[in-house]
Swiss-Prot record:
It holds the Pfam family TMEM208_SND2. Its main location: endoplasmic reticulum. It is found in: Endoplasmic reticulum membrane. The chain crosses the membrane at residues 25-45, 51-68, 105-126. GO terms for cellular component: endoplasmic reticulum membrane; intracellular membrane-bounded organelle; vacuole. May function as a negative regulator of endoplasmic reticulum-stress induced autophagy. This is Transmembrane protein 208. Belongs to the TMEM208 family. It is a multi-pass membrane protein. Residues 162-174 have a biased composition (Basic residues). One of its GO terms (biological process) is vacuolar protein processing. Residues 151-174 are annotated as: Disordered. Keywords: Autophagy, Endoplasmic reticulum, Membrane, Transmembrane, Transmembrane helix.
């Protein structure tokens, strides 16, 4: 059963603390996946490593760096001169926020990176990221724009007059 009433808001300090925890959690994921992939490729599969193995490692590093830097800049807190917290930054744990999509990219990259230690074909799963971006672009921007009807060309006054006329006609029938 859903809780009744208004959802409680978070304070600046709570957002600041949760953002620090979130950033450290995703940094551990990034470092863990990269170290694991590097150790497996260097230790176990070194003889079968090729250019694409290392290119995907560099690609994932670039994705990680961009995503982590974006999350860190979103969570940037501001303090006053006396050291008190003025702004806790953007809440990284907010649902349907941009940070949620960035966290999904980090998780997808980590999963694909670890799986790619065994087969480079797992990198095709990374195509889910641009696919999801195109889907969101279509649903939120392009789809409504293409399917919007052109009723806005008729002035609002004429629409109201037509509606009143139709109401009068309906009243006469009864």
């Amino acid at each position: 059963m859903a809780p009744k009433g208004k959802v409680g808001t978070k304070g600046k300090k709570q957002i600041y603390e949760e953002n620090k925890e979130t950033l450290s959690f995703y940094l551990r994921i990034i470092l863990g996946a990269t170290v694991l992939c590097g150790a497996i490729n260097l230790g176990v599969f070194y003889s079968s490593s090729n250019f694409w193995t290392w290119a995907t490692l560099v690609f994932s590093g670039i994705v990680y760096a961009g995503a982590y830097r974006s999350m860190r800049s979103m969570a940037q807190a501001s303090f006053s001169e006396d050291g008190s917290l003025l702004d806790g930054g953007i809440d990284l744990n907010m649902e349907q926020g941009m940070a949620e999509h960035i966290k999904d990219i980090v998780l997808l990259t980590a999963i694909v990176q670890v799986l790619s230690c065994f087969s480079l074909y797992f990198w095709y799963f990374w195509l889910l990221a641009p696919g999801r971006a195109l889907y969101l672009l279509w649903v939120n921007v392009l789809g409504p724009w293409f399917t919007a009807d052109n009723s806005s060309t008729v002035p609002q006054e004429q629409n109201e007059k037509r509606q009143r006329r139709q109401e009068r006609r309906q009243m006469k029938r009864f």
